[in-house]
């Protein structure tokens, strides 16, 4: 999976939040039922998934937090699963569509160029990443880095807005000069 993501042929998401629990991940309901072949059937809904569905890449690899059948309650019972939008054939080619569906597009106030959606996992084939019930640790390694990236985005946008406003204020003419000349004065 990783080489295709690094090449830009596939993209990835992080699927944490659910409609009923917001930031309290201990309350997630997404289920992971183990199959005889070691894969899992993932069922549940996730919200606020950035770039959760698009046709810019051949496949989207979702990292999904879910609970196995006998998982402890709370955050100690959460595991991490890799769930591709399209299943992967044995030869590495794209296979049939997995049970990952877009329910809706989220309405946002900011960062309009970064769409977010609601995803439904309907018995989607998934693969456990890392040890069972330790998924939150792995996910938050990525989340902490993403928080820094979002902060840097905000800094870049605010710096651009400031530089644009400063440049405009230096060229904008406003009203008459106070020294009784007939020319306009800078803002």
Give names to the regions the model predicted:
Residues 1-30, 34:
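Internal maturation/activation junctions in enzymes
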Residues 39, 43-97:
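A short core secondary-structure module
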């Amino acid at each position: 999976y990783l080489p295709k993501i690094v090449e830009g042929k596939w993209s990835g998401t992080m699927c944490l939040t659910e409609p009923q629990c917001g930031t309290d991940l201990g309350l997630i309901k997404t289920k992971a039922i183990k199959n005889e072949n070691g894969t899992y059937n993932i069922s549940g809904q996730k919200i606020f998934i950035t770039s959760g569905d698009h046709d810019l890449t051949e496949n989207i690899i979702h990292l999904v937090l879910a609970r196995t059948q006998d998982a402890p309650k709370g955050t100690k019972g959460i595991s991490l699963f890799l769930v591709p939008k399209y299943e992967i054939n044995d030869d590495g080619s794209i296979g049939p569509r997995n049970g990952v569906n877009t329910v809706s597009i989220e309405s946002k106030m900011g960062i309009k160029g970064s769409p977010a959606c609601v995803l439904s996992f309907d018995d989607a084939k998934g693969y456990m990443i890392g040890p069972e019930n330790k998924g939150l640790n792995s996910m938050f390694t990525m989340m902490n880095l993403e928080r820094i990236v979002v902060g840097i985005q905000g800094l870049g946008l605010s710096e651009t807005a400031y530089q644009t406003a400063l440049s405009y204020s230096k060229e904008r003419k406003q009203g008459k000069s106070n020294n009784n000349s007939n020319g306009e004065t800078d803002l």
